[in-house]
């Protein structure tokens, strides 16, 4: 498929601080210009609840779902270009961060407690970053509902979960991609 764009694949263990923090340096070497889009989507999603959560489950969820996006946001902001000035004097950002949160931040349950706490904090980080980094960087979040059946989830539970949303349906991956595409323009 020929789209007329260059694509570079980078891999890092995001639970490893050195690998995480070196991503932008590796990326800048490859593309030879500032990175203009950051999508914080990497995530750990493991079951626990208030009774079964451990220090390890807490740490893994906080690190992958909050700490890594926070420091990637910092690195992104350091290298993002200044916004363009339009003819009418208004500014237009050339950089965008999109955090993938979860519908659970608005639709709380007693399951996946440490995951939900971390994603809720990522939603807060999104709002703080949007204010702190404007007008240089636009920061948004997408909080999809049930999209893919979890490995451990029964089909009937998955269908029930999709029907429990306000629209009584889940999200499709193509809808999420179209939303991200729109927000990143």
Predicted feature locations:
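C-terminal helical subdomain
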Residues: 141, 160-185
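Conserved NAD(P)H cofactor-binding loop of Rossmann-fold oxidoreductase domains
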Residues: 41-46
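A short, exposed helix-loop element centered on a Lys and neighboring polar residues
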Residues: 73-74, 127
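Catalytic loop of short-chain dehydrogenase/reductase
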Residues: 85-134, 146
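The beta1-alpha1 cofactor-binding region of Rossmann-like NAD(H)/NADP(H)-dependent oxidoreductases
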Residues: 11-22, 55, 174
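Conserved SDR Rossmann-fold cofactor-binding beta-strand/turn motif
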Residues: 138-148
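Substrate-binding pocket helix/loop in short-chain dehydrogenase/reductase
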Residues: 49-50, 54-62, 161
């Amino acid at each position: 498929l020929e789209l007329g764009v260059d694509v570079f694949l980078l891999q890092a263990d995001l639970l490893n601080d050195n690998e995480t923090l070196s991503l932008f340096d590796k990326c800048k070497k490859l593309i030879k210009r500032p990175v203009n889009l950051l999508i914080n989507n990497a995530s750990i999603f493991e079951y626990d609840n208030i009774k079964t959560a451990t220090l390890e489950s807490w740490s893994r969820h906080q690190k992958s779902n909050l700490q890594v996006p926070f420091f990637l946001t910092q690195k992104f902001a350091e290298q993002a270009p200044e916004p363009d000035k339009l003819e009418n004097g208004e500014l237009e950002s050339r950089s965008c961060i999109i955090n993938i949160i979860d519908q659970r931040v608005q639709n709380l349950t007693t399951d996946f407690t440490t995951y939900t706490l971390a994603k809720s904090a990522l939603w807060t980080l999104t709002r703080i970053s949007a204010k702190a980094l404007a007008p240089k960087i636009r920061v948004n979040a997408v909080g999809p509902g049930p999209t893919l059946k979890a490995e451990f989830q029964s089909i009937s539970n998955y269908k029930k979960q999709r029907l429990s949303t306000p629209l009584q349906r889940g999200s499709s991956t193509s809808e999420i991609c179209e939303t991200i595409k729109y927000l990143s323009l």
